[in-house]
Amino acid sequence: MAHKKAGGSTRNGRDSESKRLGVKRFGGQVVIPGNILVRQRGTQFHPGVGVQIGKDHTLFAVVEGQVKFEVKGKLKRRTVSVVAA
């Protein structure tokens, strides 16, 4: 009789789904209120003028205008603003 020994088991084979984080609207792009600008974990980017932050640290536009990325302050914080186009 033909025999085949049992194959060993593996402890691999799992991976989490990617979360699609990152900058969604780049500098100079025109946005309307509600547009998501940045999806992030923690505050890599801080909200500036015309931008608010969601409970998952998502930055979104609250006014219509052009996206502007800046480095501000003594702590060199990266901020995202929406200025009138």
From Swiss-Prot:
Signal peptide stretch: none
InterPro entries from the UniProt entry:
Ribosomal_bL27, Ribosomal_bL27_CS
A GO molecular-function descriptor: structural constituent of ribosome
- List the keywords (alphabetical): Ribonucleoprotein, Ribosomal protein
Q: Name one Pfam family in it.
A: Ribosomal_L27
Keyword Ribosomal protein on entry: yes
Its Gene Ontology cellular component terms are: cytosolic large ribosomal subunit
GO biological-process terms attached to the record: translation
Q: Where do the segments described as Disordered lie?
A: 1-22
What family classification does the UniProt entry report for this protein? Belongs to the bacterial ribosomal protein bL27 family.
Instruction: Report the HAMAP family cross-referenced here.
Output: Ribosomal_bL27 (MF_00539)
Q: What is this protein called?
A: Large ribosomal subunit protein bL27
Give the source species.
Marinomonas sp. (strain MWYL1)
